[in-house]
Swiss-Prot record:
Originating species: Penicillium fellutanum
GO biological process: alkaloid metabolic process
Pathway it works in: Alkaloid biosynthesis
Domain (FAD-binding PCMH-type) ranges: 114-301
Recorded name of the encoding gene: phqH
One family name in Pfam for this protein: BBE
EC number: 1.-.-.-
Primary role: FAD-linked oxidoreductase; part of the gene cluster that mediates the biosynthesis of paraherquamide, a fungal indole alkaloid that belongs to a family of natural products containing a characteristic bicyclo[2.2.2]diazaoctane core. The first steps in the biosynthesis of paraherquamide is the production of the beta-methyl-proline precursor from L-isoleucine. They require oxidation of a terminally hydroxylated L-isoleucine to the corresponding aldehyde by enzymes which have still to be identified.
Protein name (database record): FAD-linked oxidoreductase phqH
Length: 602
């Protein structure tokens, strides 16, 4: 103990010297790119940009800037793939600090329309060389660079005010091979990793699922068909219905092609650039480099059964409903341990004081009669508690056929604030664990439009069977069996008071209640984050953060790649434009050291 405390004070002394030394200067990124309001920029920097980006460089304006001259803007605003400036959660197109926005629902015919957090310029790239040129341009001019694939981000990480956007949606290509051999240093012979598929950064999950169904294989992917599978989904960990049986998205990555902050294209796998390979697989998107393609392990196709329960509690959030949630929580680890997946959504406050619950179960690799028995028993118990339950079951000869069913365009242009925490298998399978979770959720307050998600597809045999150090995600993924998400619906048209109220409720009441379930030992999912986490390093990476921060300094010493909540973001202001002062940086560093000492003495 004395040795540990002595080490702490030594670190503290060194830290004081580092953070208050004269060479730790604050600085801001340049704004010369945006020195003109002309539609055709005339600054020297923009002349250079137009040269390297033509024909793909463009001025970016908020979607509704064209309203009402283009009436279709209002309806197209809910299309995920509409335009480079559009984000799935359009509250991140607004600037809360400046109270600036541009929204059709709140825009008078001749009213003001502000840029908000929408990038000023966008470079739509469709080749590795184009990515390299844009990165070199941004680095040479010290610009704020934001990487956007499809704009599916719940914390505003694919956009930033006063930024240049690297739009990777044009990096298409799906290449399936029966035997994939990773690239290795010259003279080194490596074995084949078996069947695999290489996808460009712009390939959507639905596009890959369609290609897989045609070729007869399956691949681990998410539930949203318009998410770029090689982007933030994979780089944040990535889970889906195959995760319990096949692992997380990052567990199935064999090779990554990435452009570094120096504009150099490199290959990262288990044979070369291993540190970068580790960091990208869970360290967060837009942080260590611009990923241009990823090779995923594939699996043979298999039968599957999809079961759905639509549950209505006619008396709302009464004790019978929460007892039914306890029943569901007991069933989830049973199914997940079999390699199956469960996804449940609760709409707590609906018209007429009713509560809706939908449960989808994915039984993989066989008809799973015993798995269906679990679900049928769950249905009976819910009905016995006075809930109305409608059920359906559909079997598929091939799982790939189900995954490839067109899902339509995912809803965009919506307002939402979320927070998530992982829940351990140990708690879920304990005698009192499910009741404790249910009672905790019952004590929270809910408003119309709130959503509660219980996803039993983050853990399972394939996740537990891997070493914690194999991936950069929070170590608690190893023991997790469920992700619990709280969602607050927000007005799409800017309502600054509503935004603050949702943030306060999540930060002060709801998240602390979830944290207390397991004394803060479980992390959160970076893909569904609370945008205002006070300690993102602790929540999303835990003990892996120190190594990630070291690798960030090695591969991107100037923090060209930066996102909200991302590795290294504590060194910058909220939008990544200016480095924070020495005192503020020290306070963050000091709090992390105190946390470490507390863990030593616990």
């Amino acid at each position: 103990m004395a040795f540990q405390l002595a080490g702490f004070f030594l670190i503290l002394a060194l830290g004081l010297g580092h953070y208050f030394s004269n060479d730790q200067e604050s600085r801001c990124r340049q704004l010369e790119l945006y020195a003109t309001k002309s539609i055709i920029p005339t600054t020297p920097a923009m002349s250079s940009f137009n040269t390297i980006a033509t024909p793909h460089g463009a001025l970016t304006i908020p979607v509704n800037w064209l309203y009402p001259e283009v009436p279709k803007v209002t309806s197209a605003h809910t299309n995920c793939l509409f335009i480079a400036a559009a984000l799935q959660v359009d509250t991140w197109e607004h600037s809360r600090p400046l109270k600036q926005s541009c929204h059709a629902q709140d825009l008078p015919e001749h009213g003001q329309c502000h840029q908000g957090r929408v990038a000023h310029y966008s470079a739509y790239v469709n080749s590795v060389s184009a990515v390299q040129q844009v990165i070199q341009f941004a680095a040479s001019h010290r610009l704020r660079l934001a990487i956007r694939n499809t704009g599916h981000d719940l914390a505003g990480r694919s956009s930033a005010p006063n930024s240049l956007q690297l739009h990777t949606a044009g990096l298409k290509g799906i290449d399936y091979v029966e035997s994939f051999t990773p690239q290795a240093p010259a003279g080194q012979s490596v074995p084949s990793d078996g069947p695999a598929v290489t996808v460009g950064a712009g390939v959507l999950t639905g596009e890959l699922y369609s290609a897989a169904a045609e070729a007869g294989y399956t691949v681990v992917g998410g539930s949203c068909s318009t998410v770029g599978i090689a982007g933030g989904w994979m780089q944040g960990g990535g889970y889906g219905i195959l995760t319990p049986s096949r692992g997380l998205g990052v567990d199935n990555v064999l090779e990554i092609g990435v452009v570094t902050a120096q504009g150099v294209y490199v290959t990262a796998n288990q044979y070369q650039n291993q540190d970068l390979f580790w960091a990208i697989r869970g360290g967060g998107g837009g942080t260590f480099g611009a990923v241009v393609h990823v090779t995923f392990r594939t699996y043979p196709d298999s039968p599957a059964t999809v079961s759905k329960l639509n549950v209505v509690s006619p008396h709302g959030l009464n004790s019978a409903f929460w007892e039914a949630i306890t029943d569901l929580l007991r069933a989830i680890p049973v199914l997940v341990d079999r390699g199956d997946a469960v996804q449940a959504f609760v709409m707590p406050v609906m018209p007429g004081n009713t509560t809706f619950l939908t449960i989808e179960s994915y039984l993989i690799n066989e008809t799973h009669v015993s798995g269906l028995d679990v679900i049928r028993e769950l249905k009976k118990s819910m009905e016995a508690r006075g809930l109305s339950v409608e059920s359906s079951e559909e079997s598929f000869d091939w799982l790939s056929a189900y995954l490839a069913i067109p899902k339509g365009l995912d809803q965009a242009g919506m307002g939402m604030m979320t927070a998530s925490r992982l829940v351990s298998r140990e708690l879920m399978t304990s005698a009192q664990g499910p009741s404790l979770i249910s009672q905790t959720l019952a004590q929270l307050s809910y408003d119309p439009g709130n959503v509660l998600s219980l996803e039993g597809m983050v853990g399972g045999p394939a996740v537990r069977g891997r070493e914690t150090a194999d991936r950069a995600t929070h170590p608690s993924w190893q023991s997790a069996v469920m992700s619990l998400t709280l969602g607050h619906s927000l007005p799409s048209a800017p309502d600054w008071t509503a935004y603050s109220r949702a943030q306060r409720e999540l930060a002060m009441t709801q998240l602390p209640a979830l944290q207390a379930l397991e004394q803060g030992t479980m992390g959160g999912y970076l893909g569904i984050p609370f945008p205002y986490e006070s300690h993102p390093s602790r929540v999303f990476w835990g003990s892996h953060y120190d190594r990630l921060l070291t690798l960030k300094g090695r591969w991107d010493p100037d923090d060209l790649f930066l996102t909200r909540l991302g590795v290294g973001s504590e060194r910058w202001d909220e939008e990544g434009m200016c480095r924070v002062g020495r005192a503020q940086a020290f306070l963050w560093w000091y709090s992390s050291i105190v946390d470490r000492v507390k863990s030593w003495t616990a």
